[in-house]
Amino acid sequence: MEDFPISHSHTRHFTTWLSDHRCLLVVSSYNTHHIFTLSVDPKTFEITNWKTHVNRSMGIHYSPATQNLIFSNVGNLMIYKDKGELDHPQFGKFENNFIPQFAYFSGDVDVHDVCESSTGEIYYISALFSCVCQPSKNGSFKPYWRPPWIDKYAAEDRCHLNGMCLVDDVPRYVTSTCTGNSMGAWRHSGQQGKGVVYDIVENKIVCDNLKNPHSPRWYRDKLWIMESGTGYFGYVDLEKCSFVKCAFLPTFLRGLDFIDNYAVITGSHPRHDPAFKELLIGKEIEDRGLDPMCGIWILNIDTYDIEHQLMFNEPVKELYDIAVVPNANRGRILELSDQSLLNLFYIEKNKN
């Protein structure tokens, strides 16, 4: 895709919210092959946009414990570090600058959600191989877990395993579009209402009959998820094994993070892939007299009110994930091709 300006509109107090919470919003857009970094310029009180070319960017995760920003592109898992304040010759000072530190070549295993423990253990979903993986120094990836309905590791995207979250520093909950065990089974007719949330530790399904569940996140002792096929954000009642719908958003939901008492949610225009033709979200939006949107929503998890939103304009149509970087302002991600990286030197402190 040719270069393009980032164009968006937002509600009146979106900038105030972003400034008050002093955070960066890092969003992956795989249809434009970019990651967008949104923050507030303290001088102008306007939103600063920075876009970084990342080929088919999907899962993205920020760990406050390690200060790693981890994201996927086609064939790689990238680990970036925040190196603090740097000046840009054209755009001035950026307080937070993420530069490349490591890369793991995995091949195109269709990385979806990515997580990191507080001790630096990295886990990710390979939708292609229907499993939870870890980076490997000796292979494309190291399998960590696969669903009990999948009988072997095969590059067949059988059930479209997509989402994952950690609890107590280990992978605990995953989301899957169905429980099929054949090549592309999730794409077959009748599978879109058979999504599940699975507890890896307890080895059981904790919620089923979901329409394309996505983005499980453990926050404030609740398991939050999004049902992309219906447009509902909510949580799983683990005692009743049911999905509690909390708020409807006119978008194809994917991408969720939290800060304070807010859920920060991303969504895309409804999918036109034949595999998603049975989903209700498009009709639900139409029946409500709404327009489908691609953007970011700020939702209060105490009241379930949507308090702020930012909508992207063309050509941004699809987002996958979002990471909230706290205690940060006016940030950017430097591209591997950025020549300034050749003259940035950081000496690790000797612990002795």
Residue ranges of model-derived segments:
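Sequence-structural signature of mature extracellular/luminal beta-sheet repeat domains
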Residues: M1-N352
